[in-house]
C-alpha cells in the first residue's frame, strides 16, 4: 500500500522499510506498528536547499489559490484582457490617411509625381528585354546628359601606375648612378 509521494516531501516510515542494523531487526512488530504513524522527519534534518525549495513551493501554492487558478501556470489559457482590442490596432490600407495628421503637416514621401525626370518605360519593349544596341545607346545618352564622356577622353598619363624611367641610369647590382663607380666583388 504505497502512497503517492511528492518529490520534495520527506518520506514517512513504513513497515516495508528494513533497518540496516541487525540488532535493531529484533524489534517486535508491535513496536513497528506504533512507529508507523511517526515521521522520519524527527531524525532527518533537511538541507537548506530543500527548505528553500519547500518554501517556494508553498508560496506558489498559496499564490495559485489566491488567484483562483488550479494547476500549473503553463497549462492555463491566456486571459482575454491580455490581447489588444481590435479597435486600437491601426492597419494601413490602400488610400489610408492618418486621422491625427493635421493638414499643415506634409507627408515624408510624395508618391504622386508628374516630373519629367521620371524614367520612361515606353522606350523599352514589353517582350522581356531590349536589344544590347538600344541599351548601349541609352547609356551613352545618359552619360552625355550627365556630362561624362568617359569613352571619348583618353586616360591621363599622370595617373599611370608605372613609374617613369629615371634620367640617370642605375646599376642594378649596387644601385649606383653613372657618376659613381660600381665594383663587383
Curated annotation (Swiss-Prot):
Domain of life: Eukaryota
Sequence positions bearing N-acetylmethionine: 1
Chain residue ranges for the region called Disordered: 1-131
Residues bearing PTM Phosphothreonine: 113
The keyword Metal-binding is annotated on this UniProt entry: no
Biased composition (Polar residues): 66-80
Modification Phosphoserine, positions: 47, 72, 102, 115, 122
A Pfam family per the record: FAM219A
Extent of Basic and acidic residues compositional bias: 52-61
Low complexity: bias regions: 122-131
Stored InterPro entries: FAM219 (IPR029339)
Record has Phosphoprotein as a keyword: yes
Keywords from the UniProt entry: Acetylation, Phosphoprotein
Family from the record: Belongs to the FAM219 family.
Protein name: Protein FAM219A
Source organism (scientific name): Homo sapiens (Human)
The gene coding this protein: FAM219A
Amino acid at each position: 500500500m504505497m502512497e503517492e509521494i511528492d518529490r520534495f516531501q520527506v518520506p514517512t516510515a513504513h513497515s516495508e522499510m528494513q533497518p540496516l542494523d541487525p540488532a535493531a531487526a529484533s524489534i517486535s512488530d508491535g513496536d513497528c506498528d506504533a512507529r508507523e504513524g511517526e515521521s522520519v522527519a524527527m531524525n532527518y534534518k533537511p538541507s537548506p536547499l530543500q527548505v528553500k525549495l519547500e518554501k517556494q513551493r508553498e508560496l506558489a501554492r498559496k499564490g495559485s489559490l489566491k488567484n483562483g487558478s488550479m494547476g500549473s501556470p503553463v497549462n492555463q489559457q491566456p486571459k482575454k484582457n491580455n490581447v489588444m482590442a481590435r479597435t486600437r490596432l491601426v492597419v494601413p490600407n490602400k488610400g489610408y490617411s492618418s486621422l491625427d495628421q493635421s493638414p499643415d503637416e506634409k507627408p515624408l514621401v510624395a508618391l504622386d509625381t508628374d516630373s519629367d525626370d521620371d524614367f520612361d518605360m515606353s522606350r523599352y519593349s514589353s517582350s522581356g528585354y531590349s536589344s544590347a544596341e538600344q541599351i548601349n545607346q541609352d547609356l551613352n545618352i545618359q552619360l552625355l546628359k550627365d556630362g561624362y564622356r568617359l569613352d571619348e577622353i583618353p586616360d591621363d598619363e599622370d595617373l599611370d601606375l608605372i613609374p617613369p624611367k629615371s634620367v640617370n641610369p642605375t646599376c642594378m647590382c649596387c644601385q649606383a648612378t653613372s657618376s659613381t663607380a660600381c665594383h663587383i666583388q
